[in-house]
């Protein structure tokens, strides 16, 4: 058995390994709403806390946790998340434009995705966490692997 998100007041319940709770209609509506929030944000990432606050449910954080486990939302960096379609697009666009060994700067990412410096930094952090780029020493640039 392992702990999985549930509604026992502590946010967890015991269930056989691999068990996934059935999504209630309320869960599905909340998950669809959260998905829309991240989709509409695009590359201007929304924090998980901010997205959860836009869902009118007391268990919004629990729903977000289940969506993370089900890989319906993806961590970009820290508390910032998006949906797989956006994260896939980030990886694809960067891999198409840059080759191994090339340096990528925050300014280039900012221009490529038409985002703020903060969101460009989150994209670089995400790419580093995915192992696609590595730190070069300068805070504002990474090198393609």
Language-model regions: role of each:
Residues 1-145:
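C-terminal non-catalytic scaffold/interaction domains in large multidomain proteins
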């Amino acid at each position: 058995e392992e702990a999985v998100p549930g509604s026992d007041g502590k946010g967890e319940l015991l269930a056989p390994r691999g068990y996934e709770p059935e999504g209630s209609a309320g869960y599905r509506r909340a998950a669809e709403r959260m998905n829309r929030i991240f989709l509409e944000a695009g590359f201007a990432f929304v924090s998980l806390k901010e997205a959860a606050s836009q869902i009118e449910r007391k268990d919004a954080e629990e729903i977000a946790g289940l969506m993370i486990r089900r890989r319906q939302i993806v961590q970009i960096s820290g508390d910032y998340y998006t949906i797989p379609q956006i994260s896939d697009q980030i990886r694809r666009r960067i891999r198409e434009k840059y080759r191994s060994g090339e340096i990528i700067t925050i300014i280039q990412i900012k221009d490529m995705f038409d985002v703020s410096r903060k969101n460009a930094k989150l994209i670089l952090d995400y790419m580093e966490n995915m192992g696609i780029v590595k730190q070069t020493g300068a805070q504002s640039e990474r090198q393609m692997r």
